[in-house]
Amino acid sequence: MVAVAGALWHQFAMAKKTYRGSCHCKKLRYEADLDLAEGTGKCNCSYCWKVRAWTMAIKPEAFRLLTGKESAREYGFREGSTNHHVFCGHCGVRLYTHGHVEEIGGDYVSVALSTLDDLSPSELVEAPVRYMNGRDDDWFHTPAETRHL
C-alpha cells in the first residue's frame, strides 16, 4: 500500500500546480507554479537560520505578486547584493526572495513554503529536501549537521 501511495504521489507531483500564498495579514498575496517533486531547500546561512527558511526556487515567470506591492519591503544582506528578501511591511512575514545567481540558472524567486495557503502538510512532508551549507559559503554541499534545519 505504501508503494502505491508513493507511486500516486510521484504521478501527482510530476506536474506543476498553482499555489496561492500570502503574508499573515493578507496584504501581500501571490501565486506560484510549483512542482514539489523538483525539490525544496533548507539552508544554514545566517539569514535562513534566523527565519528557519524552507523554500523552493523557481523561475520569475512562475511567480505572480497579486496584491500588496505597496506593502512589500525588501532586505538585502550586503551592499550590492543581488538577492533581496521580501517581507510585509505591516505584519513582518517574509514571503520570498528574488535575485540572480548564475550558478543556479540566473534569475530566480525562492518562495517561503510556510506562506503557501493551500499547501497540505502531506504535500510538504513528501517533497524532497536539499540542504545547503551557506554558513560555510559551500552552497553545493550538504552541511555536516541538518537535523536543526
Would you name each region that the model predicts?
Residues 5, 9-22, 27-149:
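A short Gly-Trp-Pro
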